[in-house]
Amino acid sequence: MKMTRRAFVKANAAASAAAVAGVTLPASATNLIVSSDQTKIKWDKAPCRFCGTGCSVLVGTQNGRVVATQGDPEAPVNKGLNCIKGYFLSKIMYGKDRVQTPMLRMKDGQYNKDGDFAPVSWDVALDTMAEKWKAALKKHGPTGVGMFGSGQWTVMEGYAAVKLMKAGFRSNNIDPNARHCMASAVGAFMRTFGIDEPMGCYDDFENADSFVLWGSNMAEMHPVLWTRISDRRLSHPHVKVNVLSTYYHRSFELADKGYIFEPQSDLAIANFIANYIIQNNAVNWDFVNKHTNFKQATTDIGYGLRDDDPLQMEAANPNSGAMSSISFEEYKKSVAPYTAQKASEMSGVSEEDLITLAKQYADPKTKVMSLWTMGMNQHTRGVWMNSLVYNIHLLTGKIATPGNSPFSLTGQPSACGTAREVGTFSHRLPADMVVANPKHRAISEKIWKLPEGTLNGKPGAHAVVQDRMLKDGKINAYWVMCNNNMQAGPNINTERLPGYRNPENFIVCSDPYPTATAQAADLILPTAMWVEKEGAYGNAERRTQAWYQQVQAKGEAKSDLWQIMEFSKRFKVEEVWGEELVAKAPEYRGKTMYDILFKNGQVDAFPLSEAQELNDDAKAQGFYVQKGLFEEYASFGRGHGHDLAPYDTYHTVRGLRWPVVDGKETLWRFKEGSDPYAKKGSDWDFYGKPDGKALIISAPYEAPPEVPNDEFDMWLCTGRVLEHWHTGTMTRRVPELYKAVPDALCYIHPADAKKRNLRRGDEVLISNKRGEVRVRVETRGRNRPPEGLVFVPFFDARILINKLILDATDPLSKQTDFKKCPVKITKIA
């Protein structure tokens, strides 16, 4: 090969730079340098694929492959920063075991539940699925099919799934994995404010005087937001950081005060703070009188277990979300027992420390930002706990103004934008509407051009009940998309795996990798990831962000959206609706679900010419499907406090926080002058409630369903670590992240280790009546539990720690408590 002098100089310069950086260039690197077309990296924006922070990244592509990512300096969320996971986004799609063709369990050339996985065509895969779905619908009706989706679905994927299940199959048995992470937050938002999602935004980080973390390790789980807290704390000496947790973690390193409390006693701490505010005349009476009402929650509501479970049978008011009106004096009386002494006895936190925390809320000059994630939400009284923190902010009027913000952080990139806003929960419809409300069903049927009575008014099976119905043979056809519930969910051995392997059931898993869930399924569908498709996410501060497809998917992988739409083509309306309903819309006779749901003159309203050249989903359908779905979905919220901008706008900005009215985003909701829906002269307007008033809800401490005993004498808490995300499906396939933290460990207090004759690195058996796992002990490091508690992260597929978790839920939100269950620790010889 001949080289020009200029090319030679460039090649040597590149080699020199590589040598300085300690990198060895391949021999063919000079070829890349000679060809300017090949060396040119194309950059475009996209929201990060990981957590709910919503960082924007710049994605570099070359020769049809993502080769680099970097923090987006124009992004207001992360301002050019990435966390360690974000820096390796370019590698998440290129794991060696990427599934690239549909895989069906086969024996002797036919589907067989006990067969081995074998590659099949998409037509065979989808035709087999359709056959199983039709059989389940014929046997059980709409309740015989189910879908478990994701807070990682794009907005369009989730919306298409809702239409397919709720309008097409007329089944409300669709739920997202956000049920495991955000359902308690949703429940409390709806009870307290009548509308979902935070009233504040990330600008609060630069305005608060005090930060209080209630069960959130932001240093590892939301590290980019943690940098904003760190900057505020280190730049302003008066700012205080408070961290409450059941064990010591990295967020404590910045904290001015750390509070280690007994599991479940956060209920007592929050009630104490409310009592302290009242007893010390710190109630903002002007705010309380104008903008709040008082309610009493129904108590002794059980734990969301099966109806025949003894714990559930003991409850006086199982699963009741009823509330009764009370006066302020009655509320005052309800929190009066929670004195500093009582709360200290219950929590293990000193009276002095409890008062230190309460004073920050009570001081009218201190702007307080409360933050929480799974520690509060994954809780058998998670809705109550969320509400108790809202009570504190409402009593003091510290809400919906810069720096005063009770803020529920999300764990997935579109738990807000897709699971919550789109309404992929079993009881919801888009824009905070619910299936149980006839008016909401009528609105949805009108927008979707469905005959009256199409939508089912009974909420469907939520995540935990879906497992039980599969086990009991009541759901026979089930589709898992964009999650790994066989590793992430609770009580795997007893309630989940039996349903997957039930001979009556057909389980489909759409995933890019052979996860634990995929391996337990009957059909694996290879899925396009992240920038292999066009989409949109919604983050924790109500910011909607969109991105274009930037590379093509590996092999035969297809997006979840393509899969949903192609599947819908295999059902004629007569096969799923029944004659009575079809008779109301005779023009639909002979049409497919695809024709009715996605070729309805709205979803297909935008021509292919409007889409980018690289848009495989649009090309497959022959129209700009992402824009059509988004605009139809957005029509639910416009004019109703959930306004989204036109779809094309999101491709020109780094996201906008809804409601977006007249092109302007909203930073603080409910506050006059900031929120366009707040009435003039109202000052604050909680317009989700008919009278514009938020609720202060009294709820007591109630014990968890299980506590340690003589046999199972330790608490187990499960969660995450910085380097891995959820079940590690993506991060464990990034070599640098895998090498950094290859294995899950059992973090244990040195005194507990000594009692059991354990040393760091010893292998132990963690067990209870639901199962056992083998894991190595860690007595040092980032996580330091108190005596009596161990922490084990759940990213490691070889250590299915969540099999030990009881499938008890908050009866109101149906969210599982992954933060506390009794276990015993035994040394393995």
UniProtKB/Swiss-Prot annotation:
The name on file for this protein is Periplasmic nitrate reductase
Q: Which CDD domains does the UniProt entry name for this protein?
A: MopB_CT_Nitrate-R-NapA-like, MopB_Nitrate-R-NapA-like
- Which Pfam families does the protein's record reference? Molybdop_Fe4S4, Molybdopterin, Molydop_binding
Region forming the signal peptide: 1-29
Q: What's the name of its gene?
A: napA
Residues binding [4Fe-4S] cluster: C48, C51, C55, C83
Q: Which organism encodes this protein?
A: Aliivibrio fischeri (strain ATCC 700601 / ES114) (Vibrio fischeri)
Query: What SUPFAM superfamilies does the record point to?
Result: ADC-like, Formate dehydrogenase/DMSO reductase, domains 1-3
List of residues binding Mo-bis(molybdopterin guanine dinucleotide) = 85, 152, 177, 181, 214-221, 245-249, 264-266, 374, 378, 484, 510-511, 533, 560, 718-727, 802, 819
Q: What is its EC number?
A: 1.9.6.1
Required cofactor(s): [4Fe-4S] cluster; Mo-bis(molybdopterin guanine dinucleotide)
Query: What modifications does the entry list under PTM / processing?
Result: Predicted to be exported by the Tat system. The position of the signal peptide cleavage has not been experimentally proven.
Organism lineage string: Bacteria, Pseudomonadati, Pseudomonadota, Gammaproteobacteria, Vibrionales
Q: Which PROSITE patterns does the entry mention?
A: 4FE4S_MOW_BIS_MGD, MOLYBDOPTERIN_PROK_1, TAT
